[in-house]
Amino acid sequence: MSEDLSMKCGLEIHVQVDTNSKLFCQCPTNYKDVEPNTNICPVCIGHPGAKPMPPNKKAIDMAIMVAKMLGCEMVIDKDIYFQRKHYNYPDLPSGYQKTSVPIGEHGKFLGVGITEVHLEEDPGQYKPDLGTVDYNRSGTPLIEIVTDPDMKSPEEAREFLRQLLRLFRYIGNLRGEGTMRADTNISIKYNGIQGNRVEVKNVNSIRGVYKVLKYELIRQKNVLRRGGEIKLETRAFMESQMITKGMRSKETADDYRYIPDPDLQPIVLNNEWVEKVEAQMPETPMNKEKRFVEQYGIKEDDAKVLVSDLELADVFEKVVAELGNDKDGISLAVTWIRNELKRVLVYNKLEFFETNLRPEHMVELINSIKDKTISQKIGKTIIEQMVEHKGEKTPKELINEMGLTVIEDTSELEKACEEAIKNSEKAIEDYKSGNQRALNSVVGQVMKLTRGRAEPATVVEILKKKIDG
């Protein structure tokens, strides 16, 4: 019997704004590299009578920018007030979290509806296994993005988050996946039976969200298949086991006892404020991708790879400009940045900014290949060494250090070709019988003998002269 299974998923994504001070006080937002409970004050640890400052202007601007880039309608000329969201947990010393009503609503990103974008404060960090709480993080500004339940598979949700994080990198001033947390909401329909919505809280990676959704899809299907009922509940993600575990019944808005915060004046956005923020908005990844195809005449796949990393895209444009902005320069830049540099970055699990390479390094490398100072094979070795040395050595320094310039002495090349011919009797016979490809293995022998320092086209020319007479 065939199974009829479908799922709906919505996400609540929390991303930290990279500000110097917290949302409602002047405490620094650095909480990773300091002693516990040092970057705190009466406001961020909820002392009775401590009055919050007006919300951090940069955090509001970033929330506006995120909302606009997600296609939201801005809440203009209306009170945007902060509410107290009440719940009891050790990481929330005041007993409530300050969270704004929506700043932007009804957006769309990659076909997924954006319900709302709003600001809130991050709670502290509670470690139940140790029984300790660090309040350094308490009060750090968070932007929360709430999606409609439009994602139909774990794979869709994973791709949505990947593209959203790419957008965050383009926007800047957001702290990305290392601090991103997502609450996942999933419900399934199995053979006509609709299950209740289940929320899994505080999943802190794209991989985690994917694993949660895969696990919940199977778990809920098995419950319904056995005639059980899916509870409307909140569950926790047990990352070490890659499973979810029931925490409590699902809360409603009434459970949080939302009330406007009497200590904070409402924010009122106007068109002038929003337009100022819009003027600072960067080009979106999707627009950059389209522009690369149109402006540089490169393939869509190449543009997609280049644009996937903002720094890589910037390097590409700078290198193309240095190489003359012509067809040959663009082709070389694509080959050595999109293909070779990206290959080395992926292998080493690095982003471009982590390598300390500069655009001029890539220009110097490509020019060394263009003027035949080094072969393409050696170029691949040099790019690997450039990344390994974290940009401390230029391509020319590495080429000279390693003695990797192209062999220009014809007699040296002829000697290597003669040795390769001597060791490749079968390949020579096949070549003489009409198999042109057989010569490739002989060329490979020469490249090996010369440590890649021979120019392949020159090697082929010498080999043909010697074999064909």
Curated annotation (Swiss-Prot):
Pfam families: GatB_N, GatB_Yqey. SUPFAM superfamilies: GatB/YqeY motif (SSF89095), Glutamine synthetase/guanido kinase (SSF55931). The keyword Ligase applies. Disulfide bonds: none annotated. PROSITE patterns: GATB. GO terms for biological process: glutaminyl-tRNAGln biosynthesis via transamidation; translation. This is Aspartyl/glutamyl-tRNA(Asn/Gln) amidotransferase subunit B. It comes from Methanococcus maripaludis (strain C5 / ATCC BAA-1333). The lineage of its organism: Archaea, Methanobacteriati, Methanobacteriota, Methanomada group, Methanococci.
